[in-house]
A protein has these predicted regions:
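RecA-like P-loop NTPase motor core of helicase/translocase proteins
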Residues: 1-227
């Protein structure tokens, strides 16, 4: 097995990862594992003094419980979702229609996970408890790496909520009033692309909203502020 990696990219960005490099602490070599890496992070071991120390891996237990359920739900055709949601998911995942505007798997999985938590039948979420601070609003977080298209996912989340609310006004799971709180003026300026009527908005630029739903997006109220 190699001590260094000569082929870093081993998965397609448009498909669920199928393999990963794993560092074996005993052999001090990298091993190619034929499965997706479980969610987790690495932190320095207590008392570590060497830069060569590989650190301690901490698994994200909740994420690893949710991932297979979302995958099964996806494979079953997203049961429990509204007709609007089904159309959006089909539009986002149809690679034949999207051509050069294909979305990354990380983006699709991020939006799927939020939708699954909100729309999937209750039995799908048995045993899943997301910690809360007890406030009026439940906080959900999709952690994504730099460069994976977080702003595009925000556009997907907004369109999903707005289009469902406009279509089903009595459904309290959705809203067409969106508040985005940005850290700093630069980020606030960059997020103007999330306002549907703005020039070069992401709903058009990245083909987030199907043509049949474009007019409905005008009923949204998107406000971007600094904290």
């Amino acid at each position: 097995m190699p001590k260094t990696i000569d082929r870093l990219i081993i998965n397609s960005p448009y498909e669920e990862p199928k393999e990963h490099w794993n560092f074996n602490n005993f052999t001090q070599e990298f091993e190619l594992e034929k499965e997706r890496r479980s969610a987790g992070y690495v932190r320095a071991r207590e008392g570590a003094t060497s830069l060569d120390e590989s650190g301690e891996r901490i698994d994200l237990i909740l994420v690893n419980k949710i991932r297979p359920r979302v995958k099964k739900w996806r494979e079953e055709g997203y049961p429990g979702t509204t007709s609007v949601t089904k159309k959006l998911l089909s539009f986002w995942t149809n690679s034949e229609d999207r051509k050069d505007k294909r979305l990354f798997f990380a983006q699709i999985e991020a939006i799927e996970t939020v939708i699954w938590y909100v729309e999937a039948p209750p039995n799908e979420k048995t045993g899943i408890e997301i910690p809360s601070d007890g406030g009026l609003f439940q906080r959900l977080c999709s952690k994504m790496a730099t460069g994976t298209g977080k702003t595009v996912v925000m556009a997907m989340l907004i369109s999903w909520s707005v289009l469902n609310k406009v279509t089903y006004p009595q459904d309290t799971r959705f809203s067409k009033a969106i508040l985005i709180v940005a850290p700093g003026l630069t980020v606030k300026e960059r997020l103007q692309v999330l306002i549907p009527d703005s020039e070069r908005n992401y709903y058009d630029e990245f083909q987030i909203v199907p043509l049949e739903f474009r007019e409905k997006m005008r009923q949204s109220k998107v406000k971007i502020i600094n904290w």
